[in-house]
C-alpha cells in the first residue's frame, strides 16, 4: 500500500510540474485533477434500465418541429441504433387536421395533405436499421375537447384497416400498434375505447402487439399551457392502484403492454408507484414498460432536455422495479446529437458514459 501511495504522490507531483509549465493555476487544481473520478461519474454505472425504444414525435401537441428531411431522419435512426434502440413508435398518425401519411379517409374528412409520407419513411428506416415500428393511432382532438374517449373509435376503425392494407402488409418492420389516447385516471369511455381499438388492431394484423402510455396523476400533472409546475391535488398510490386495477381488468386481453409516463411524480415517489405498476401488470399478464421522459418538467420553460441525473434516477427506479422495457419521449428532440437543442447531445454523451457505450 505504501509503495502505491508513494507512486501516486510522484505522479501527482509530475502533474503539478506539468500544470505550472503550461500555465496551470497551481497545486490545488492539479491535485483535484488527479483525484479518483475527476471529470467522470462518481455513481455506479449501468444500474438503470437501458432505453431500447423511442417515440417519434412528428405530429405534436406542444413540441416544436425540427423540419427534418430523409437525410436528417436517417442520421437520427443511426444515432438511435448506436445506443441500442430497437423500437420506434409513431406518437400519433395525425392530430386534428395534420396527418403523417396521405390517408384517403382522413383527407376526405378535411385533413391537410402532408408534403412527405412520414409513415413510409419511418417504416423504411426502421427496416434499414433492424428496428420494429409501432403505429400510433389517429387523434381527432375530440377526447381532449370533451373528456370522452369513445369518439376516437369511429375515426380509427377506418384508419386501422387503411394503414394495415397500405403499409402493414408491405413492410416487415411494421411491428405493432400504439393506442395513442392518453389517460391518467378512470376516464369516461376509456376501457371500452382501448378494448375496441386493441381488438381491431390485433384482428387485422394477425395478433401484432399493442400498448398504451398513460400518465400518473401526480403533483406535476399540470396543463402544459399553464404557468404552474405543480398542483396540490395528486393521486395517492392506493387510489392509483385501485383505478388501474379496474382498467387493466377490462383491457388486458387486447393490450399487451403499458408504459406509464414517469415525469408527473416526484423522484422520491418513483419506487412506490413503479412497484404498483409492475404488480398490476404481472397480475394481468401484461408487460410493464416505462416511458422515461427525456424532457424536464421541473423547468418553467416547456420543454427542454432533462438533467442527466433525473433521467438516471428514473431508469434506476425502473430497474429496481423489474420493468420489462424502457422507452422514451423522445430521442430526436431531447437526446439526439443533432437536435435543435444543444444540451440534447450532451445528454446523449452522459447516457453513453453511464452505460459504457462506445
Label for each model-derived stretch:
Residues 70-141, 190-211, 270-280:
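Aromatic-lined substrate-binding rim segments of carbohydrate-active enzymes
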Residues 88, 259-267, 286-358:
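Substrate-binding cleft of secreted/luminal carbohydrate-active enzymes
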Residues 52-62, 141, 209-229, 262, ...:
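Active-site clefts of carbohydrate-active enzymes
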Residues 113-129, 148-175, 200, 240-251, ...:
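An active-site-proximal structural segment forming one wall of the substrate-binding cleft
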